[in-house]
Amino acid sequence: IDPPRYCNHIICYEDSECSQWCTAGCNSITSKCDT
């Protein structure tokens, strides 16, 4: 399973599926979740 293609900080904190991928936060360059 790949991390969500697009994320922002609100999505990372509020969306449980995204937040499990965003353990290292959102990559501001690629707009992807870092694991």
From Swiss-Prot:
It is found in: Secreted. GO terms for molecular function: toxin activity. It comes from the Eukaryota. Disulfide bonds join C7-C22, C12-C26, C18-C33. The modification 4-hydroxyproline is found at P3, P4. Expressed by the venom duct. One of its GO terms (cellular component) is extracellular region. The modification 4-carboxyglutamate is found at E14, E17. Keywords: Disulfide bond, Gamma-carboxyglutamic acid, Hydroxylation, Secreted, Toxin. The cysteine framework is IX (C-C-C-C-C-C). Belongs to the Pg turripeptide superfamily. This is Turripeptide gsp9a.
